[in-house]
């Protein structure tokens, strides 16, 4: 039996709309849900196997994308949010009641500072960028997944057209390396 990766992948990937203008994310609380308005579409939307990202119940992976932080605004019940681990690079703001991660923000110097991490499946609107790749695939082993099953996981991703990586995609790794070289003075600040 094939593993459950994530509903947005297992149920068939729906192509997003490149002109999509954003929408509202809602936590899972039936009463007074936290609402976060995203003022645009996400980029680099991907399946993530790390142990820190929020995943729907029964899923091995989260699906997470990034959006400029100035396009992220909490519009309802902000008092219900708390940071799960304030020592982490990505400060994941989750609902205290239902546990859903609403957005992750980086405050420390980092190549992705200025981008917030969000789960667009929390929105009813259609048009969000579809998953582009799968990252940190081997990390599911750290969470108790039998390593003998990882080839099957990779095959399942490839069957829906997603490339798999054990870090991030090459484009994102290049961005991280470029930022690091710029910080160390090995590359000019503007390329």
UniProtKB/Swiss-Prot annotation:
Q: What is its EC number?
A: 4.4.1.22
| GO process annotations (BP) | formaldehyde catabolic process
Residues annotated as coiled-coil are: none
UniProt cofactor note? Binds 2 Zn(2+) ions per subunit.
Q: What is its pathway?
A: One-carbon metabolism; formaldehyde degradation; formate from formaldehyde (glutathione route): step 1/3
List UniProt keywords, sorted A-Z: Lyase, Metal-binding, Zinc
Q: Domain CENP-V/GFA, which positions? A: 20-166
**CC cofactor:** Zn(2+)
Q: Identify the residues that bind Zn(2+) 1.
A: 27, 29, 95, 98
Reactions accelerated catalytically: S-(hydroxymethyl)glutathione = glutathione + formaldehyde
The GO terms this record gives for MF are: S-(hydroxymethyl)glutathione synthase activity; zinc ion binding
List positions binding Zn(2+) 2: 48, 50, 53
The entry sums up its family as follows: Belongs to the Gfa family.
The job of this chain, per UniProt, is described as: Catalyzes the condensation of formaldehyde and glutathione to S-hydroxymethylglutathione.
* This protein's name: Putative glutathione-dependent formaldehyde-activating enzyme
């Amino acid at each position: 039996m094939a593993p459950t990766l994530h509903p947005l992948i297992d149920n068939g990937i729906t192509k997003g709309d490149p002109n999509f203008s954003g929408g509202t994310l809602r936590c899972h609380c039936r009463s007074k849900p936290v609402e976060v308005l995203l003022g645009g579409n996400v980029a680099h939307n991907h399946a993530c196997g790390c142990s820190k990202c929020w995943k729907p119940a029964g899923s091995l992976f989260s699906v997470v994308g990034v959006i400029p932080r100035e396009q992220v605004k909490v519009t309802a019940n902000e008092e219900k949010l708390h940071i799960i681990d304030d020592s982490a690079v990505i400060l994941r703001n989750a609902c205290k009641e239902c546990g859903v991660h609403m957005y992750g923000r980086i405050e420390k110097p980092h190549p992705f500072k200025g981008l917030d991490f969000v789960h667009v499946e929390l929105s009813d609107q259609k048009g969000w960028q579809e998953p582009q790749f799968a990252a940190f695939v081997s990390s599911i082993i750290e969470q108790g997944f039998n390593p003998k099953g990882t080839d099957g996981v990779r095959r399942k991703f490839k069957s829906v057209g997603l490339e798999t990586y054990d870090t991030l995609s090459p484009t994102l790794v290049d961005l991280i390396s470029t930022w690091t070289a710029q910080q160390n003075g090995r590359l000019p600040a503007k390329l």
